[in-house]
Amino acid sequence: MKHMQNPAISLKPATKADEPRLSQLLSDYQSELLPYSGHSEADIATYKYLPHYFTDPERTAYFILVGHEVAGFVLVNTHTLVEPHAHAIAEFYIAPAFRRGGVGAQVAAQTFAQFPGKWEVAQMATNQSAIQFWRSVIH
């Protein structure tokens, strides 16, 4: 990450033209989850739901920007497992260079504010870092 004085953190809706970039970030994200999933690098496949984020009005994909740099993504949908009529964080990824500086917490707050109401957020039971992050964000 380039050093910037308090760069703005924002969400930018991803478009169909952004699909290759988002697909690459999803691949990076899935690679980072391998130690928690029990899968191998060979098991990483294309994120099968990605095309739906450009056609289904119940799904929204955002790039996370720190200044003008892409720092990750958040995928939001209404396909919840427990809470009907709610939104879900389907996937949430902050690139390593942007972690530990409050970016994730700010993005979570912006995302929740953009879609008021009930939310569902799930993590892998073995991913203690994710569990701690979401507990600190949600309180």
Please provide the spans of the model-predicted regions.
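Conserved acetyl-CoA-binding loop-helix of GNAT-fold acetyltransferases
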Residues: 94, 100-113
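Helix-loop element at the rim of GNAT/NAT acetyltransferase active sites that forms part
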Residues: 24-40, 53
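Conserved beta-strand in the GNAT
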Residues: 63, 69-78, 88
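A short beta-loop-alpha structural element at the N-terminal edge
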Residues: 9-24
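Conserved acetyl-CoA binding element of GNAT-fold acetyltransferases
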Residues: 84-96, 122
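Active-site rim helix/loop that mediates acceptor-substrate recognition in acyltransferases
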Residues: 39-63
